Amino acid sequence: MGQQRRSPLETVFLPLPSSQTTSTHAIAHFVLPACLFYSRSIFDHWGCRSKSTASTSQTRHCSVPLCWAQTQALRYHHSVHTFSFQPKYSSIYCLFHLRRKYTLSNTTPLPRWRSRCPCGSFSNVSMKQGHFSENRFELAYFTS
């Protein structure tokens, strides 16, 4: 288990909203073939780690597997730092890999959206971003 293999799943980089932007909407284009159910602790299972790069800035990196359905219900449980996903329809839409990278610094420009699909099958997916915890981990959730 010491060796980590790169997953051929979707990789998306999310921007950290500035102080005047509390929420962000964007479009990602991809469809992947299958999905699994995940209910994981961010810090225990998703490998989120943060380190101070300067006295006023902090860098955090997260690799997060998520899934969603045509209409989805995604909940964040504050006390245990856990996301649970409950599809409202039986046909689950997609599984993708989300890598979170941002720098908490007012001098660093925000990164842009980047997404690519290894499958060659594309579809428009609407994305909305929200704040779920005090350490500013933003989760993107998708609905078709």
From Swiss-Prot:
It comes from the Eukaryota. Overlaps TAD3. This is Putative uncharacterized protein YLR317W.
